[in-house]
Amino acid sequence: MIDSDGFRPNVGIILTNDVGQVLWARRINQDAWQFPQGGINARETPEEALFRELNEEVGLEEQDVKILACTRGWLRYRLPQRLVRTHSQPLCIGQKQKWFLLRLTGAEDRVRMDLTGKPEFDGWRWVSYWYPLGQVVTFKREVYRRALKELAPRLPVRD
């Protein structure tokens, strides 16, 4: 499902623990790290996509997390030209994302990257809230900055 501007609707997931760290996931067989994210299917709400992607990519169920916040609007990034599939129709030039801030309420050992036949990640770790800005691929950096900045006020306060 690609919109008329060439952007694929998508959800981004920022999962926090009780001390305000975020889950940072390593893409399978790569030294590339990112937040979990995934496309929104036809007739699926962003929240429905969030829970489907959370389960597919991280192994968590709706009862394992609490939604703390969501970005107000869509945040967009363009793919580098080398990643645009120019022979695909409709042409996808990037992603438009709704970002969700979640708190893990279930046990940490419920995080599993290997529950699907085609896992996207093969590892994860907790990192400080702003750490991903310096690590994510360049073309996603501005969207990460905007999402983290907008959602930061809703981050659980450390006791």
Curated annotation (Swiss-Prot):
The name under which this protein is listed is: RNA pyrophosphohydrolase
* Lineage start: Bacteria, Pseudomonadati, Pseudomonadota, Gammaproteobacteria, Pseudomonadales
Q: What does the entry give for GO biological process?
A: mRNA catabolic process
Give its E.C. classification number.
3.6.1.-
* Keywords linked to the UniProt accession: Hydrolase
Q: So what family is this one in?
A: Belongs to the Nudix hydrolase family. RppH subfamily.
UniProt organism field: Stutzerimonas stutzeri (strain A1501) (Pseudomonas stutzeri)
Annotated signal peptide? none
SUPFAM superfamilies to which the protein is assigned, alphabetical: Nudix
This entry's Gene Ontology molecular function terms read: mRNA 5'-diphosphatase activity
